[in-house]
Amino acid sequence: MKYISFLLSLCLCASVFAQNPQTYFTKEEMTNLVNCLPAPPDSGSLEFANDILRYMWGKTMRQDAERAAEIEHDAIWNLDTLAVIFSVPFGLEISQEKTPEIYKAFTQGVGTIELIRIIPKAYYNRKRPYVMYNEHMLTTWEEDELRNEGSYPSGHTIRGWAAALVLAEINPAATTELFARAGRYGENRVITGAHWQSDVDASRPAASIGYVQLQSSPAYREQMERARAEFVYLVYGTVPDKKYKAIVKNLAR
């Protein structure tokens, strides 16, 4: 419970409302996943049978009080909350105040990648597990908002995987911890009843596709270099390139 309490205390410093960050591409410019990922499994398939088994498994996992608290926290659709969550495996606080360049790369990078979910969600309009079974989610406060939104792919899973991809680019030494947390972040959506396992499984390559596309943005590449320079200065006390000395001066104020 200490871990959850730590996260919740950090969240008090986060903004209450989800941000709408500037993005490097529009949703129309993002790769259309309908053209490059499989459709959700048919209801008579072995894959869907596995989805049902995983949904039943997820309901048993809700009995774990610490995991349930983490799931409640992970469900909050807010980039500041996501930054709080991933600050732990990243190893530094990710915030506009303490790490402005990392924060900007993180929120705008993840905010761009997650746009890739919009078209396939509307196209497939897959029914969510809690809707299909007419049962409650663990995170009951989400139910009305999610009821008419497509289940495939999982927006939360895309966000979590995108967070790990962007932050591992800044701090490669934290790769294992970042992707372990991202994996659990997606799995938590199965446990709460928001998504089928196949939604979550498709969302990880979906995020990777968005991340590859993100690399083609010169503005993102420049912001990533600034974020790396800030990270190196904060961790090692050096500036990798003199053109980024202004970052150090701003941090020293």
Regions from the PLM with identified roles:
Residues 203, 227:
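Acidic/histidine-rich, metal-coordinating catalytic segments
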